[in-house]
Structure formats: C-alpha cells, structure tokens
Amino acid sequence: MELTRRQMLLGSLAAAGGAVLAGCGAGGGSAAGGGAGTTAAAGFPVTIEGKLGTATVPQAPRRVASVGYTDHDAILALGVAPVAARYWYGAENTVVQPWASAAARALDAAPAVLTMSSIEPEKIAAQRPDLVVGVYSDLDAQNYPVVSAIAPTVGPAKGFHDYGAPWQEQTRLVGRALGRTDEADRLVGELEARFAAVRDANPQWAGKQVAVATRGADSLSVFASQDPRSRFFTSLGFVVPPRYDELAGQSFYAELSFEQYAELDHDLVVWDQLSFTPGGRATVERDPLLSRLPAMREGRAVFLEGGTELAFAWQTVLSLPAVLDAVVPALERAIPRA
C-alpha cells in the first residue's frame, strides 16, 4: 500500500513491536457485555457539536463503530465494546493494541476491522451502528454527510486543527456520546494527576524547548504544538517553539529540508517514527548534519522505538500510562535534576 505523507506522519502501517490481543481480526463485532445501553439513559438525548456538524444521540448507544484511528481506545476505556474499529498502526489487521488488550478482553470485544486508507461507508453500515465515533479521523466535508446518514456521528472536535484534539477532549467527547461523562472525567482526572506528579518531580523541564521530529528518506518533519505528540511534552513542562506553528500553518506538522536541520536546535530533540526512517536510529545518529546538533552531541536526544513508538503514536487515555513508564526515565537522563 502506498502511503501519503500525512498517513506516514500519522504513523500508519509501522510494524512496531509488542504482543497483541488474540482474536481481534476482521469479522462481525460483538457488543456483548459492553453496550452503552447497560447504563442509565436519563441523560439522553445528547447533542454534540463538532467541526463538521452536530450529532444528536437519542438514547444510550448499543453498537458503536469507531472510524477514528485511535478512538476505540477511549470507547474501550469507558467500558464499551466497539463493533468496528479502524486499523492504523502496528501488526496488520490488528486494531486492539497491547495497552488496550485487558479492557478488550474484559468486554469480549472483537471489532470488525476498517481499513486505514479511507472511510468505508459500506463496511460501517454493515455493522448496523447506532453511533459512529471519528474524533481522531479523516472525516471531512465530503464523507461526513455520508457517514452521519448511517448513524449519529461524532466527528473531529471544534477548536482544534485536524488531528489536533488532545486525549482529554477525545475521552470526554466519547464519554458524552456514550452517556458516561462521569467515568470519562474520572479517567481524565487520574491520568492528568499522573502527568502533574511527573512534572512536579522534574521542575528542571519547565520552559525547556522541545522538538518532536522525524527523519524520512528525503526530508525532516517536526510536529506543531497542537499535535497530541507535542502536547505530551508540554504536559510535562516543556515548550514547543512558536516557530514550528508558523512553519506548519494549519497542519499538524512542518516539513523541513535537511538543510534546515538547525530548526531542531533546542534543549531536547525527540526522534519519533524511527520505524519509517531507513536504517532507523543509527541513520539519525550518523547523519552528518543532525549529529551537529548540540542536543545530539550532549545526550539531550530521546529515541522512540518499538513498542514505545507505537504507544506514543496513539496518545490515548489507555496508551499514555505505558508511554510515561517508558519515556520519563529517558527524559530524566537527557535533562536530569540538578
């Protein structure tokens, strides 16, 4: 499958490491034990305004299809088994990743697999959903009306760039649509408290500038401040240089030529999506231009590989605890406490 630049930067099709939940392949989904209809319906109907339109959910949904690349994590975290989920990253045709496997197993979730490359209205309709979730998705002005005609559709959030809504917004939007706002708030609060604890324990990171970058075969890229991957570091006290937003415009990333490598000259450089870099980490470390960066020479570079790269790409309420476990020690080595 040929990847567009956007799909590559989103992280599609990387064969990152990690065990996956057995049995989560294509086929009919099951909502057994996980339908949102098992909760009280007093809060319905629910109306949610999005960037592309308004979704009115008349009653607690029982068959939820996820067309967002990562939205099924929030659905699972809130105790609902999606009947369909979008493939994005990792082992091919696997939509439940290691950090979500326990939640999926508890719900007996076996979602039908929707392809990464495009929205598939026929496959969505075949699952007979009464709610479609596509917060972190490629829903747009052309395909949103088609999908929303199948079932009420919660699309990209208002007030954010494409693919820019943070995990908190994603979790709370899904919680509202499922009638589980209290549970969504609880999940968000617990994870935010963990970020705060790490931030408080590492005051040396406050105000330090970070570049979250990738190295492709022909160019470099850096994520803008609204991208969830950059938000991960700002949640820990780091700052994304305003220059990156200028370069990115309305996109979630800015593409740089190799000659622009000095744009990455900041306190911390984080190398992401190394599974797409020909030769991986070694290529970055040996690059004659990138190796000139002070952060590279002085040990202030962090490399996200394997299962960590995979979890970091997701940026969800379920994946982020694993990311914190893996990345915080590396950050403490790169910029240690005085």
Task: Indicate where each model-derived feature is located.
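N-terminal export signals
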Residues: 7-26
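Bacterial lipoprotein signal-peptidase II cleavage site
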Residues: 24-36
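Extracytoplasmic substrate-binding proteins
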Residues: 54, 150-217, 313-338
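Basic- and aromatic-lined ligand-binding clefts that recognize polyanionic substrates
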Residues: 63-78, 183-242
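A short, structured surface patch at a secondary-structure boundary
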Residues: 72-123
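Extracytoplasmic ligand-binding site segments that recognize negatively charged/polar headgroups
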Residues: 89-95, 139-142, 157-173, 207-232, ...
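Proline-aspartate-enriched helix->loop->beta-strand connector
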Residues: 128-134, 152, 266
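Structured C-terminal subdomain patch of bacterial secreted/periplasmic proteins
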Residues: 264-338
